[in-house]
């Protein structure tokens, strides 16, 4: 009964339930007079009047000053309750189809390629970008899909890191990537962590609503908010920021939502970017709701956020690759496809298979 629950905790950096005893109720909110603000003063801030990322007692918080996550009482309830979908989940053999990627370096067109979970390859103007590099089976997680290409064949120019949970930032992946001339674009205070995994990677840090300083590149990349949290070991909770990314290239926008709950930050992003061509949105790891709602979006919430962002094409992610929650592996995509069939999704929906090339 507890397998996926232990795996979820391991994926966020908790080796056992007992570690959670050290946490306060992580939903608690600070007061405005206890908040300090920080940002990378060397970067341009794209939101007028934005003071920087809020922090309370040296730890990052969300826009509403919450620390996100679920309190210990709810985690305990989850661990001691039966999963009502236990048998359905046990019998779910869903596996995302995989297309082999051979001759990746011969690709010339601009495109998006899904590698599973939150890892995407973006080929823009001859440069390769990789989001949230987790291409192995980290932190005792079993990966249910194979890779379409060996890690050693991924010649990446830029890594885009949304946050540091183990199912998004994998030490093995970072250490095995060919790192010559590779740059990591990361949240505030993540640089030291990345370089401890691979000292050859150049690191640039940004706060929310800040544009990375990229010389002679055909694209702009802006770091934006997400409603989430950070933890890899019990004592570093929220010491490193989390977020999402906007990529602007040749008149198109690609939004990578990272890991996030549904919150007001989507409207803030929409106010800066009138339309978004491609929205890469998380749809899985949402049950039970009383634990996951403060961390992740379910398919319906992801579509609501997509509408608020005025997105044109919805590309789902964060499902079917790892077992992180109580829902069956096939459920997130089934719910999303039902919304598409019902005409609920305003815009197009493209559920990529792993290794499938989407020209843009």
Give the residues covered by each predicted segment:
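Catalytic core of the metallo-beta-lactamase
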Residues: 119-123, 214-277, 293, 297-301
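Cap/insert and terminal regions of metallo-dependent hydrolase folds
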Residues: 2-7, 11, 38-41, 54, ...
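Metallo-beta-lactamase
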Residues: 2, 7-137, 152, 187-256, 335-356, ...
């Amino acid at each position: 009964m507890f397998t996926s629950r232990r795996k979820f905790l391991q994926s966020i950096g908790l080796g056992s339930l007992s570690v959670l005893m050290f946490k306060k109720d992580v939903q608690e909110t600070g007061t405005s007079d206890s908040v300090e603000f920080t940002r990378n003063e060397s970067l341009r801030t794209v939101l007028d009047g934005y003071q920087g990322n809020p922090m309370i007692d040296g730890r990052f918080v969300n826009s509403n000053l919450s620390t996100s996550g679920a309190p210990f009482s709810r985690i305990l309830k989850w661990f001691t309750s039966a999963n009502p979908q236990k048998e359905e989940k046990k019998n779910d053999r869903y596996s995302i189809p995989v297309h082999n990627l051979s001759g990746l370096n011969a690709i010339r067109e601009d495109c998006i390629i899904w590698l599973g979970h939150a890892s995407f390859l973006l080929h823009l103007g001859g440069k390769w970008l990789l989001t949230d590099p987790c291409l192995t089976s980290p932190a005792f997680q079993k990966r249910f899909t194979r890779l379409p290409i060996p890690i050693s064949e991924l010649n990446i120019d830029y890594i885009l890191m949304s946050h540091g949970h183990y199912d998004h930032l994998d030490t093995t992946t970072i250490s095995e990537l060919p790192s010559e001339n590779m740059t990591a674009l990361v949240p505030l205070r993540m640089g030291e962590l990345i370089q401890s995994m691979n000292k050859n990677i150049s690191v640039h840090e940004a706060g929310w609503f800040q544009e990375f300083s990229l010389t002679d590149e055909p694209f702009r990349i802006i770091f934006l908010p997400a409603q989430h949290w950070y933890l890899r070991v019990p004592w570093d909770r929220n010491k490193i920021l989390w977020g999402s990314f906007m990529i602007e290239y040749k008149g198109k926008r690609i939004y990578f939502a990272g890991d996030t709950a549904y919150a007001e930050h989507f409207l803030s992003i929409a106010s800066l970017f009138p339309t978004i061509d491609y929205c890469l949105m998380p749809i899985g790891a949402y049950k039970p709701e009383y634990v996951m709602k403060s961390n992740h979006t379910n398919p319906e919430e992801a579509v609501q956020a997509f509408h608020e962002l005025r997105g044109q094409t919805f590309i789902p992610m964060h499902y079917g690759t790892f077992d992180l929650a109580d829902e069956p592996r096939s459920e997130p995509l089934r719910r999303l496809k039902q919304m598409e069939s019902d005409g609920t999704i305003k815009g197009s929906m493209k559920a990529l298979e792993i290794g499938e090339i989407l020209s843009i």
